Amino acid sequence: MAVMAPRTLLLLLLGALALTQTWAGSHSMRYFSTSVSRPGRGEPRFIAVGYVDDTQFVRFDSDAASQRMEPRAPWIEQEEPEYWDGETRKVKAHSQTDRVNLGTLRGYYNQSEAGSHTIQKMYGCDVGSDGRFLRGYQQDAYDGKDYIALNEDLRSWTAADMAAEITKRKWEAAHFAEQLRAYLEGECVEWLRRYLENGKETLQRTDAPKTHMTHHAVSDHEAILRCWALSFYPAEITLTWQRDGEDQTQDTELVETRPAGDGTFQKWAAVVVPSGQEQRYTCHVQHESLPKPLTLRWEPSSQPTIPIVGIIAGLVLFGAVIAGAVIAAVRWRRKSSDRKGGSYSQAASSDSAQGSDVSLTACKV
């Protein structure tokens, strides 16, 4: 059986992303993992990726030839071999725990051994513009549905159903929340600070969106105006339509912010307008890189060059990455006031070979 169709993975991951949000000026480190059982084809496939803000920096795929945690950002490549040995060891331990958990959960739900099943996990921490801890989180899903989640107090759990209640009782007896809280408030924050400092030229940059508007007649009476924002970073952006100065959010078709494949992002928002009334509509673009919002209006005489090939290529790449690497199109909100600049102290050098503990959060269900 194939690991999973791109559309299925996209839906599962976007559903998980909707559960999280960051504050203005904050930074985040998040790990995403997926285990998929393959009856009759050997071990489950396990994929894990790590993100700092909107940038993927590490990746592991149990089907890859290297069988190692691999760098995905230039600034993480400077870590010593001991770091990569440690990260590989932890992520492999995580995959083995998930292998056991897949069997356990199949029993909880009285499922046969013939079907393929999926475990997903997201965990991480946020820091403010001063580098101090804001919050931590862990969320687990089974077969695309919520299973169990760490509450905001970092001391208790919310179980989604009766099967998850079994896991909740086990984890409470093992004091797993206390162990996880210590990691999220301590080591997770230290490594996030280190990564922000080492990768500040990339992680704390801003790339202004390249904007334009397109027009497509759908009938003799109506046309679609589409407002494009391309090649921007970070991912948080707002596109809004107005008619004669009045908000048109209810009538706007808006897509999720999507990675372009080159470290930047793209997004569009569209409205259907009566033919001949295009001039009454304006698109407003807000992004951290802009000193003030941009306002776009359709000009009938303009003939914009629409980079359709580039856009499609970016979306195809996005689908391929989702299918092969199980990443998330990270779109946590951050506003412009506090994000620029800032210096983050690194984790103590004595810990440099340990890495962020991606095995701690893998506990048997």
Swiss-Prot record:
GO terms for CC? Answer: early endosome membrane; ER to Golgi transport vesicle membrane; external side of plasma membrane; extracellular space; lumenal side of endoplasmic reticulum membrane; MHC class I protein complex; phagocytic vesicle membrane; recycling endosome membrane
| One family name in Pfam for this protein | MHC_I_C
Q: Name one GO molecular function term.
A: signaling receptor binding
Query: Region Alpha-1: what ranges?
Result: 25-114
- Cytoplasmic side of the membrane: what ranges? 333-365
Membrane-spanning residues where? 309-332
Question: Where does the record place the region Alpha-2?
Answer: 115-206
**List of residues that carry Phosphoserine:** S343, S345, S349, S350, S352, S356, S359
On subunit structure and binding partners, the annotation says:
Heterodimer of an alpha chain and a beta chain (beta-2-microglobulin).
Role, per record: Involved in the presentation of foreign antigens to the immune system.
From the Swiss-Prot or TrEMBL record, give the protein name: Class I histocompatibility antigen, Gogo-A*0201 alpha chain
